[in-house]
């Protein structure tokens, strides 16, 4: 594994020889060429600053991407280069971009370079340690060889699309179907039930959404358990390309030094690929399939291989994925899918029924939904639930034409059980308590399997559908049914 600390070489100064947008060429003395990925610093003088207090100088960071001969490097700027001129002095830091790590990151919002964006005026922050964002993945002999299920306590996930400890999960869903709430809930559950910490990387999405997320997380009480790194769509492509690495470096510290289980969110992983394509084009590389960068698989692999379990502790990653034009064969999502252990698809149809989390049980998948990993009982129960839901889906067109009363007895039973299963797959979230007025619930996987097995066996055929909505486990179901009977009796 790479060293935790990178020792900076003796700083060397160069000068700017070419400025073309965010691509900068810098000439250095012979024998003092900076390494690839080194961070360079250059100061831009703001000659138009007229008002009192307006910044006269701005320092920007450049990252070395290519060597051009013996004395010139080609760099990508991480901030706008307006005002940068040829001949400007550039300082080589002698090391890659390094960011703060440790408890100081919790409750704070960072940019790609590790600068704190939400520091209060009276707040004193002491950064005791910084790690470089370019690091090697864990060595093979340090990896956790055992595949374990990551229990979330969310019924639909644990039963039908179980997450892998230290695995990568793809999260699909349009606007307004509950992606943000699911992300907040997972952050809450990791802190509450796994004693872990969460890191969020906002990559190339809308600034408004990032601002809303921070506000909602503060309101839900999960901000203090989370480190956030943002490089939104108004940022330079070099910034958007490196934001996931900054967040991942912070997550690696919690895993490797503090021995914690970490949940890493990346929203949106497609924007990481898109930024890589922009940088590749700016550097003049020959494009590959559909105009993407030729090193697409290598770039994606270098990020994903660092997201893994080491002996005893893990980084589990939840990655929102945008699929261009719903084309799953596009190289960007196709390259991402190769690394995923599970997919969770949020459905607008299910959300419209008022069932949350609105996970589509038939479209969502997991590689560990296999008797070798989850056990025979779990596997059989999940398959029975899916079979009932699939049959119900097939019967919907017939029901729309002739009505449910015209179905055979077996199909009627299937439809009734499917409706109960759909309602029971919903669940109250801790972070939504103040909006719903109902307490959140954690349902152990064993209890989830037992409950759905009973529904499939017909144990609850006499219990009305309404009793299954907005509850947690078996005890909640029986208590709600008991209260409904008392009300009916009264």
UniProtKB/Swiss-Prot annotation:
Keywords annotated in UniProt: ATP synthesis, ATP-binding, Cell membrane, CF(1), Hydrogen ion transport, Ion transport, Membrane, Nucleotide-binding, Translocase, Transport
SMART domains documented for this protein: AAA (SM00382)
Membrane topology classification: Peripheral membrane protein
Subcellular location: Cell membrane
Binding site for ATP: 173-180
Superkingdom: Bacteria
Function: Produces ATP from ADP in the presence of a proton gradient across the membrane. The catalytic sites are hosted primarily by the beta subunits.
Protein name: ATP synthase subunit beta
The species this protein was found in: Bifidobacterium longum (strain NCC 2705)
